């Protein structure tokens, strides 16, 4: 069956705050479109639902925001049921004497709850508790019942809540988190997918990429609706960018020199100090690509390109302002390399479209076989990529049918393709 056409939205139900409902056949006359979005740099999933209605449900339910929306989608790649969407906004781009078109922007309950004063972070978080435990407790404080996929951190960190929103605090902690295994394994990502919340290190994602690839896609010029093998073909791939030397240099992708000073003790010299270079750290980190160190001219690989001076900020500063160089909280140079990893991960950005596939999620590694004009497989640009952004789109066609695609933005830090692990069983094999 074709992944492009064989989709059904079997249930759409809007429940007002006083229990009134509108659903297909009862207040909702038709569904025009549904867009679903997730990203490894977004703490919440998002969706847009476009419907037609012959009733004035905005006034009759009424709809004012935070109403519950339930959606069930059946597709050959899987059935997905969303039960806890809430309405963030509603617009009415078209209306007539017979029907109206309504567009709902949907968000998650946790995204709303984190804005409330009672859910802001106010307590002191113990500096002896692992960061991963802090992250789990912060999410649970929002009352979430979603699955939490939280990687254990090697370091602990203490801080005060300062009335921060939950997601802001987790992002702040992610930059200071270190993965187990030693070395320069700093830098975590926090995001949400349809299967729950994720908190994972860049290194662990990269190191397991070859064995955790869930799908493999092959570039084609077109897709046939009658050929099942075309369900895993790549349409219209293009690189948004492939390196951006000046911008990356200014954002410390190729190295930095950061000096820290303690505003409480005001020492005569900067301490601690951290210096990193692209060539010096390359072999110490895990990567998605398989090629050796990229050769850069003019000494870019061997010299810091971003110089900065920052105050030392301990999350729970001691009264005398002393810094313990042996503690993870007291040594920002241990986790300052996370900035370089975030930037290197964004070195290549490839956009593409595939037939809709609910087995894909942001943060999953996929294998992409790209072609070189008149030469077949391009082993330089092909290989394992990380899904950065994912958008499922369902549309009503002019003929009244449905078509559905998944738009992807994929990233990686290096070039090269030596083939995926032969022990991996792909979902489409």
Model-derived features: where do they sit?
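Assembly/oligomerization scaffold segments
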Residues: 1-115
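Amphipathic, non-transmembrane alpha-helical segments in extracytoplasmic/periplasmic proteins
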Residues: 48-50, 106, 117-147, 161-190, ...
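An acidic/polar, Gly/Ser/Thr-rich interaction patch typically located in mid-to-C-terminal regions
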Residues: 34-62, 218-429
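Interface-prone segments of viral and bacterial extracellular assemblies
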Residues: 1-6, 81-82, 106, 146-152, ...
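Glycine-centered loop/turn motifs
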Residues: 64-70, 128, 214-220, 363
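Envelope-exposed proteins and targeting segments
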Residues: 8-10, 45-47, 67, 81-83, ...
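Secondary-structure transition/turn motif
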Residues: 52-54, 107-112, 200-207, 411-414
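Short beta-strand-centered interaction patches in the first periplasmic/extracellular domains
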Residues: 101, 110, 149-243
């Amino acid at each position: 069956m074709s992944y492009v056409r064989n989709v059904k939205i079997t249930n759409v139900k809007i429940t007002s705050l006083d229990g009134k409902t509108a659903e297909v056949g009862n207040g909702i006359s038709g569904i025009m479109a549904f867009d679903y979005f997730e990203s490894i740099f977004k703490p919440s999933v998002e969706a847009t639902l476009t419907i037609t209605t012959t009733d004035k449900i905005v006034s009759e339910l009424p709809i004012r925001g935070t109403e519950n929306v339930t959606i069930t989608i059946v597709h050959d790649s899987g059935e997905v049921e969303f039960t806890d969407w809430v309405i963030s906004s509603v617009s009415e781009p078209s209306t007539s004497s017979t029907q109206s078109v309504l567009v709902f922007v949907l968000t998650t309950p946790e995204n709303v709850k984190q804005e409330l004063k009672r859910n802001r972070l106010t307590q002191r978080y113990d500096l002896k508790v692992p960061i991963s435990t802090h992250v789990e407790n912060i999410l649970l404080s929002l009352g979430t019942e979603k699955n939490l996929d939280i990687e254990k951190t090697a370091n602990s960190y203490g801080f005060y809540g300062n009335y921060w929103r939950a997601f802001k605090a987790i992002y702040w902690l992610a930059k200071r988190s270190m993965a187990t295994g030693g070395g320069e394994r700093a830098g975590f990502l926090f995001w949400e997918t349809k299967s729950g919340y994720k908190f994972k290190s860049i290194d662990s994602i990269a190191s397991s990429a070859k064995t955790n690839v869930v799908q493999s896609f092959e570039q084609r010029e077109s897709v046939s609706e009658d050929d099942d093998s075309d369900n895993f073909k790549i349409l219209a791939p293009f690189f948004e960018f492939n390196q951006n030397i000046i911008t990356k240099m200014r954002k410390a992708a190729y190295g930095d020199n950061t000096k820290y000073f303690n505003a409480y003790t005001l020492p005569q010299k900067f301490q601690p100090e951290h210096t990193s270079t692209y060539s010096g750290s390359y072999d110490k980190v895990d990567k998605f690509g398989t090629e050796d160190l990229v050769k850069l001219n003019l000494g870019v690989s061997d010299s810091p390109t971003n110089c900065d001076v920052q105050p030392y900020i301990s999350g729970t500063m001691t009264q005398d302002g002393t810094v313990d160089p042996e503690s993870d909280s007291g040594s920002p140079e241990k986790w300052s390399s996370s900035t370089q990893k975030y930037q290197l991960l964004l070195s290549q950005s490839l956009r593409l479209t595939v037939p809709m596939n609910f087995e894909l999620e942001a943060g999953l590694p996929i294998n992409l076989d790209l072609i070189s004009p008149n030469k077949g497989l391009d082993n330089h640009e092909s290989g394992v990529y990380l899904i950065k952004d994912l958008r499922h789109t369902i549309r009503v066609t002019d003929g009244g049918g449905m078509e559905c695609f998944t738009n992807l933005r994929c990233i990686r830090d290096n070039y090269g393709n030596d083939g995926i692990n032969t022990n991996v069983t792909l979902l489409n094999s």
